[in-house]
Amino acid sequence: MQSAMALSFSQTSFTRPNHVLGSSGSVFSTPRSLRFCGLRREAFGFSTSNQLAIRSNRIQFLSRKSFQVSASASSNGNGAPPKSFDYDLIIIGAGVGGHGAALHAVEKGLKTAIIEGDVVGGTCVNRGCVPSKALLAVSGRMRELQNEHHMKSFGLQVSAAGYDRQGVADHANNLATKIRNNLTNSMKAIGVDILTGFGSVLGPQKVKYGKDNIITAKDIIIATGSVPFVPKGIEVDGKTVITSDHALKLESVPEWIAIVGSGYIGLEFSDVYTALGSEVTFIEALDQLMPGFDPEISKLAQRVLINPRKIDYHTGVFASKITPARDGKPVLIELIDAKTKEPKDTLEVDAALIATGRAPFTNGLGLENVNVVTQRGFIPVDERMRVIDGKGTLVPNLYCIGDANGKLMLAHAASAQGISVVEQVSGRDHVLNHLSIPAACFTHPEISMVGLTEPQAKEKGEKEGFKVSVVKTSFKANTKALAENEGEGIAKMIYRPDNGEILGVHIFGLHAADLIHEASNAIALGTRIQDIKLAVHAHPTLSEVLDELFKAAKVESHATTRTGDAKIKLNTNQEDRKGRRRGGDDEKQPSVSKDLKDISTRPSSFFENISVGVLSLLSLIFV
């Protein structure tokens, strides 16, 4: 789900043996470090090479046939895997992750089926990202119309703004319906079989759906997503005590609503409710609001998004019991101290929204048939999304993507994981770098981030022995932001001054959710600051906020560029370019930290090609 924080579970590391067939044919074990529900804390490399070295042995990834795994199969009486298959790939769950995997699978020539027990689109399309953005679009326009000072600064005069609740709700519902139909039609158009019914794993390479339908596939992907997490002691009636599923229907706009949890979900709904006239009270178990964000960004966001609005908050407390409104009585919330568990306060409000994160939807999937034991409900997987059984061994031909594995509970992360799995089953090794996946909170202004927070980066630097630097730029110095009268905001980058590696970027300001992708792509490609600061940005645009950010970074003079030369040669001849493609300069490149593995790329050439392409296009237009 795009706007859902992972549950606040402590991060736990597990080391499991991974049995792999070596080049000599012998089976050897190599430790595999696994982490569950570690939002933004997993750093996996991105490998496109045809060979992967493990210890002194080499595993060949030249084709699907040469990539073999020794794994324990189920012995629960389900028998051996079938010799022939109905499909190349079966996907259980037709959310954003399953949809992305299905489209990529057909592109790779795989006969594909997708099973859905509810409606196509999953949480994101029907009860998450899509309808919430529709509501936030309304809240953004309401805020602008209600801000008399802001409108006068443009020379505009606007009468009092109002809204029709049902009309707003219809806008969100209609958008969800449209996107759901688009997803369904896109799969039908390319020949994906959409099977209706609850799907479960019956055994190795075997799936059951509906009452008694059994089908087989070479590979199976579990993509069942998540549901709202409701702590014990909270009674949800769907009317006065609600989850995000209910809130998105906007059946009412209460005068006073308590929001339990101040992560992505809670923060976005506070934006909607306050714009529509509600008073909001946050209840947060930790000592500060917005605990999942970079601390500096959290403080600024609180100053802009919380303090000036009709919002108060209680931090360091649990809602131990919430009783819905009934018999003319309001919603009753009992608060206790998060540390001592002593009673703290009692609140009486019109409604309460439970925004305490999401829990994996993995019950009833038949995981016991392949000896898989969940971890807090999450299905354990390795860095290639391969499912791991209770003995720490890979389950053959079984993968899990998205919220169900807990690696990064975002819709686009699920889609990326699905595409990564399809690459693997098609014969090309692919490991997704989760630190390059951006996240965004669509408040007004927006918040976005990619990579590590400042505390996380400094902790990593201390452990691995490198220095961490921080640089910031302000939206108040950006021409486009000032033209929009939206100068409130900053961009912040955490990086290594010794080699120019970008460790994290955080943005708070106008269209932050759109701006973050330049930084996320830089991290994904391993682009160094000394390279990307030479890129040209159109003026005047908001993208110049990042342009100034990159230029403000101080990289040590001895740090080399990605091509191994501190002086970028823009006028390189064809032979020089061929030499670089052959990898002649690769040996000179500085090593990237082990959490962000290098891939062969030349950012300077990329920007040169883009510039040449743009100039060529312009010449065609104006000649």
From Swiss-Prot:
The lineage of its organism: Eukaryota, Viridiplantae, Streptophyta, Embryophyta, Tracheophyta. Homodimer. Part of the plastidial pyruvate dehydrogenase complex (PDC) containing multiple copies of three enzymatic components: pyruvate dehydrogenase (E1), dihydrolipoamide acetyltransferase (E2) and lipoamide dehydrogenase (E3). It comes from Arabidopsis thaliana (Mouse-ear cress). NAD(+) binds at G261, S262, G263, Y264, I265, G266, L267, E268, E284, G357. The gene is LPD1. It catalyses: N(6)-[(R)-dihydrolipoyl]-L-lysyl-[protein] + NAD(+) = N(6)-[(R)-lipoyl]-L-lysyl-[protein] + NADH + H(+). Its EC number is 1.8.1.4. Belongs to the class-I pyridine nucleotide-disulfide oxidoreductase family. Lipoamide dehydrogenase is a component of the plastidial pyruvate dehydrogenase complex (PDC). This is Dihydrolipoyl dehydrogenase 1, chloroplastic. Disruption phenotype: Arsenate hypersensitivity.
